[in-house]
Amino acid sequence: MSDTLQSLDQLGSLKVSAPDAPQHLKKVDKFNRAYATGKRKDAVARVWIKPGAGKVIVNTREVEVYFARPVLRMMIQQPLVAAARAGQYDVICTVAGGGLSGQAGAVRHGISKALTYFEPELRGVLKKGGFLTRDSRVVERKKYGKAKARRSFQFSKR
């Protein structure tokens, strides 16, 4: 850096060339679909999105049938709503492992990643919303000498 800074206010105006910065390109297959995998807890979702009418299919079933709770359906739609693309893409996904909540989180993560593959300019919006970050929280293991991960057996003084 040949430019010298006189104050911290000038730091924002300083431009650094980054030729090694990753270029986010459109990644679609021959059927004009973007594919991504999403993960949450023990669930893994394989997601394909393509331009369409906003239809969501999970494990060959409608989303209303597979995810009966409205909260889970809302969770799946969040990345599309945040990117202002609700009703513009058809989503087809297969999801396995974990429970319904983990599966909904995995589908949401997969939809977010697939959207960035289809439209790389949406990456900033989705990243700011936290949709591209893998939620790394998993169940804590049970320890020996304990009833559960942290719960101790009942203690008796006498």
Curated annotation (Swiss-Prot):
Keywords from the named record: Ribonucleoprotein, Ribosomal protein
Keyword Ribonucleoprotein belongs to the record: yes
Gene Ontology cellular component list: cytosolic small ribosomal subunit
Gene Ontology annotations of biological process type: translation
Pfam families, alphabetized: Ribosomal_S9
One GO molecular-function entry: RNA binding
Tree of life domain: Bacteria
Transmembrane segments: none
Family per similarity comment: Belongs to the universal ribosomal protein uS9 family.
PANTHER family: RIBOSOMAL PROTEIN S9, SMALL RIBOSOMAL SUBUNIT PROTEIN US9M
Protein name: Small ribosomal subunit protein uS9
Species for this entry: Rhodopseudomonas palustris (strain BisA53)
